[in-house]
Amino acid sequence: MDAEFWLERWRDGRTHFHQQRVTPLLAKYWPTLQLPPGCRVLVPLCGKTLDMVWLAQQGHQVLGVELSSLAVEQFFAENGLQATVREAGPGTYYSAGDISIYCGDIFDLGADVLGDCVGAFDRAALVALPAAMRPRYARHVYGQLSAAYRGLLITLDYDQSQMDGPPFSVRDDEVQAIYAGHSEAVLIDRRDILSKEPKFAERGLTQLDTLVYRLQRQG
């Protein structure tokens, strides 16, 4: 799986992973992080999620990262935002108000950008990556965030033999292994969501849990 996989999904309109609402678990647990007002929050592999609008409404400076320029342009258009555009190395920044999206590869961003992020929200990034790429992603992104960072991570847990990802199953033991060495991942919620996600039952799943973690720099 490479960048072209996701670019093709956006071109073909196969974006069932996009939610037409703010993630309820974000709204429930984000206030518990007690992040300072005005701080920068990273939303990796953001697509055109409405979570970025919600985070900006909470007083944050939002930095999304997305490969597809089509997704980025749709986000600003659908939310009535006029973005300014500037080139930045191999990628492009789109900005409007308190929301900026870096259109490019997240691995091209270094500590000069990621180090300014005090918050992070990952609903769609870790579960979108194949297993071999997840440790590298976590080290690169979370290892370079502000030393004071706090964030939320949402994953899925299901029998991978019943369905091919993405989204992939990322169990608790894997989360702990991936983030060990730079971050603490504390499981704060786990719930069965299969009855609310019939499309996954149609793909053969008999069990589907969502897991919510509070992340912070390892003390």
From Swiss-Prot:
Subcellular location: Cytoplasm
UniProt superkingdom: Bacteria
Keywords: Cytoplasm, Methyltransferase, S-adenosyl-L-methionine, Transferase
Alphabetized Gene3D superfamilies for the sequence: Vaccinia Virus protein VP39
Alphabetical list of InterPro entries matching this protein: SAM-dependent_MTases_sf, Thiopur_S-MeTfrase_Se/Te_detox, Thiopurine_S-MeTrfase, TPMT
A single MF term (Gene Ontology): thiopurine S-methyltransferase activity
Keyword Magnesium annotated: no
GO cellular component, one term: cytoplasm
PROSITE patterns in the record: SAM_MT_TPMT
Catalytic activity field: S-adenosyl-L-methionine + a thiopurine = S-adenosyl-L-homocysteine + a thiopurine S-methylether
E.C. number(s) listed in UniProt: 2.1.1.67
Any one Gene Ontology BP term: response to metal ion
EC class: transferase
Membrane-spanning ranges: none
Binding residues annotated for S-adenosyl-L-methionine, in chain numbering: 10, 45, 66, 123
Main location: cytoplasm
UniProt-listed SUPFAM superfamilies: S-adenosyl-L-methionine-dependent methyltransferases
HAMAP family: Thiopur_methtran
Family: Belongs to the class I-like SAM-binding methyltransferase superfamily. TPMT family.
Protein name listed in UniProt: Thiopurine S-methyltransferase
Organism of this sequence: Bordetella petrii (strain ATCC BAA-461 / DSM 12804 / CCUG 43448)
Taxonomic placement: Bacteria, Pseudomonadati, Pseudomonadota, Betaproteobacteria, Burkholderiales
